[in-house]
From Swiss-Prot:
Domain of life: Bacteria
Name of protein: GDP-mannose pyrophosphatase
Family according to the record: Belongs to the Nudix hydrolase family. NudK subfamily.
Keywords carried by this UniProt record: Hydrolase, Magnesium, Metal-binding
Any one biological process term the GO annotation gives: ribose phosphate metabolic process
The enzyme's E.C. designation: 3.6.1.-
GO terms under cellular component: cytosol
Cofactor annotation: Mg(2+)
PROSITE patterns (alphabetical): NUDIX
Position of sequence motif Nudix box: 86-106
Coiled-coil segments: none
Domain Nudix hydrolase, residue spans: 43-180
Length: 198
């Protein structure tokens, strides 16, 4: 379906943290009909996320931190278990996840594998998230992690089977984490032990 888009108004409502804009636009459909819409669009930049996994130990590394938006929407303590992630700012996606992995988890990852790029909330948020996986070993842990400044991130090294059960039980509710854990499950990467030693 081909659409012709004509922006009527694009007004910035806030630039306090990221950019919130109010847009009025018309869509001309393939049949020639025109529909006018008014929407708010939140531009927070693009991001990247990585799931660290160890085939030999059958473990994954996740993080737990407070997310105020989840608390507002009924998450009783606001704590969320997630994959390591961050906004790109001016970095390339791979550079971003390497930096975030050290800051949040303490691991300096080696080879990383990019899987895909996804819109996570396309109804009103512009962000595209770049998804990665990377194998880790105990020898790659150079710091305790925990994030920077006041992030207070808890690092969780969990058995892969436990992480999958936590998804099934609703304990892991972060979309990034669910997608990457299920990818790891269906890919067969965790079906056998790695030849690498820790």
């Amino acid at each position: 379906m081909s659409l012709n888009i004509h922006v009527i108004k694009d007004k910035i409502l806030s630039e306090n943290w990221f950019v919130l804009r109010n847009m009025t636009y018309e869509l001309t459909r393939a049949d020639g009909s025109v529909v006018r819409h008014k929407r708010e669009v939140y531009d927070r930049g693009n991001g990247a996320t990585v799931l660290l996994y160890n085939r030999h130990k059958q473990t994954v590394v996740l993080v737990r931190q407070f997310r105020v938006a989840t608390w507002v929407n009924g998450n009783h303590d606001g704590m969320l278990i997630e994959t390591c992630a961050g906004l790109l700012d001016n970095d390339e996606p791979e550079a971003c996840i390497r930096k975030e992995a050290v800051e949040e988890t303490g691991y300096e990852v080696g080879e990383v594998r990019k899987l895909f790029e996804l819109f996570m909330s396309p109804g009103g948020v512009t962000e595209v998230v770049h998804f990665f996986i990377a194998e880790y070993s105990d020898a790659q842990r150079t710091t305790s992690g925990g994030g920077v400044d006041d992030e207070a991130i808890e690092v969780l090294e969990l058995p892969f089977s436990q992480a999958l059960q936590m998804v099934a039980d609703g304990e892991i509710r972060d979309g990034k984490a669910v997608i990457l854990l299920q990818y790891l499950q269906t890919s067969g990467l965790m079906s056998g032990n790695s030849d690498k030693s820790d």
